[in-house]
């Protein structure tokens, strides 16, 4: 998701 940071452990890089 673009709403999640790419380095965020709770947000996949996708």
Swiss-Prot record:
An annotated GO cellular component: extracellular region
Motif window: Cell attachment site: 6-8
Domain of life where this protein originates: Viruses
Keywords from the named record: Acetylation, Activator, AIDS, Apoptosis, Host cytoplasm, Host nucleus, Host-virus interaction, Metal-binding, Methylation, Phosphoprotein, RNA-binding, Secreted, Transcription, Transcription regulation, Ubl conjugation, Zinc
Main location: host cell
Disulfide linkage: none
GO MF entries: metal ion binding; RNA binding
Post-translational modification, as annotated: Acetylation by EP300, CREBBP, GCN5L2/GCN5 and PCAF regulates the transactivation activity of Tat. In addition, the non-acetylated Tat's N-terminus can also interact with PCAF.
Intracellular or extracellular location(s): Host nucleus, Host nucleolus; Host cytoplasm; Secreted
Comment field on protein domains: The transactivation domain mediates the interaction with CCNT1, GCN5L2, and MDM2.
Binding partners and assembly: Interacts with host CCNT1. Associates with the P-TEFb complex composed at least of Tat, P-TEFb (CDK9 and CCNT1), TAR RNA, RNA Pol II. Recruits the HATs CREBBP, TAF1/TFIID, EP300, PCAF and GCN5L2. Interacts with host KAT5/Tip60; this interaction targets the latter to degradation. Interacts with the host deacetylase SIRT1. Interacts with host capping enzyme RNGTT; this interaction stimulates RNGTT. Binds to host KDR, and to the host integrins ITGAV/ITGB3 and ITGA5/ITGB1. Interacts with host KPNB1/importin beta-1 without previous binding to KPNA1/importin alpha-1. Interacts with EIF2AK2.
Family membership: Belongs to the lentiviruses Tat family.
Role description: Transcriptional activator that increases RNA Pol II processivity, thereby increasing the level of full-length viral transcripts. Recognizes a hairpin structure at the 5'-LTR of the nascent viral mRNAs referred to as the transactivation responsive RNA element (TAR) and recruits the cyclin T1-CDK9 complex (P-TEFb complex) that will in turn hyperphosphorylate the RNA polymerase II to allow efficient elongation. The CDK9 component of P-TEFb and other Tat-activated kinases hyperphosphorylate the C-terminus of RNA Pol II that becomes stabilized and much more processive. Extracellular circulating Tat can be endocytosed by surrounding uninfected cells via the binding to several surface receptors such as CD26, CXCR4, heparan sulfate proteoglycans (HSPG) or LDLR. Neurons are rarely infected, but they internalize Tat via their LDLR. Endosomal low pH allows Tat to cross the endosome membrane to enter the cytosol and eventually further translocate into the nucleus, thereby inducing severe cell dysfunctions ranging from cell activation to cell death.
Other comments on record: The Z-84 isolate was taken from a 54 year-old Zairean male. HIV-1 lineages are divided in three main groups, M (for Major), O (for Outlier), and N (for New, or Non-M, Non-O). The vast majority of strains found worldwide belong to the group M. Group O seems to be endemic to and largely confined to Cameroon and neighboring countries in West Central Africa, where these viruses represent a small minority of HIV-1 strains. The group N is represented by a limited number of isolates from Cameroonian persons. The group M is further subdivided in 9 clades or subtypes (A to D, F to H, J and K).
The protein's name in its UniProt record: Protein Tat
Source organism of the structure: Human immunodeficiency virus type 1 group M subtype D (isolate Z84) (HIV-1)
Organism ancestry: Viruses, Riboviria, Pararnavirae, Artverviricota, Revtraviricetes
């Amino acid at each position: 998701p673009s709403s999640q940071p790419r380095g965020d452990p709770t947000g996949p890089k996708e």
